[in-house]
Amino acid sequence: MKIGNDSNKEVKIFVKNIHMSAYKLRRVVNQIRGHSYGEAVMILEFMPYRACYPVLKLVSNAAENANHKMGLRKADLFVSEVKVDAGSFAKRLRLRAQGRNYPIHKPTCHITIILKKKSVYKEEL
């Protein structure tokens, strides 16, 4: 978690080795980038993909951390950055006919989410 001055507060949270392909997760996180916390949660709850569940847990956890540790309201937060990186493959073998094996690669990925406080500037005339 990174703490700056009042207008630059941000919460950075990440999770590693989610058993899902990065391609499928990117399809979900591209929809919430730049939205406020409330809009992001609503989008994730109504999308029909399995990849929404870990992203929803992570966004909710980041907002709770910002509320508890830095005293920020959830309504003041927006999704500044979302990054999904490919992780390593879990390698398995599937038995095939005539004593052969077939390799199976189960992909993993890492998610990084940065929530920032909305800054409102008043223009002086």
From Swiss-Prot:
CDD domains named in the record: Ribosomal_L22
Gene Ontology cellular component terms for the protein in this record: chloroplast; large ribosomal subunit
Cellular localisation: Plastid, Chloroplast
Signal sequence range: none
Taxonomy, superkingdom: Eukaryota
Keyword Endoplasmic reticulum among UniProt keywords: no
Gene Ontology biological process terms, A to Z: translation
Alphabetized UniProt keyword annotations: Chloroplast, Plastid, Ribonucleoprotein, Ribosomal protein, RNA-binding, rRNA-binding
GO MF term list: rRNA binding; structural constituent of ribosome
InterPro entries in alphabetical order: Ribosomal_uL22, Ribosomal_uL22_bac/chlpt-type, Ribosomal_uL22_bac/org-type, Ribosomal_uL22_CS, Ribosomal_uL22_sf
Pfam families in the record: Ribosomal_L22
HAMAP family: Ribosomal_uL22_B
Similarity comment text for this entry: Belongs to the universal ribosomal protein uL22 family.
Entry function: This protein binds specifically to 23S rRNA.
NCBIfam families listed in its UniProt record: rplV_bact
Assembly notes: Part of the 50S ribosomal subunit.
Protein name per the record: Large ribosomal subunit protein uL22c
Organism: Huperzia lucidula
Lineage start: Eukaryota, Viridiplantae, Streptophyta, Embryophyta, Tracheophyta
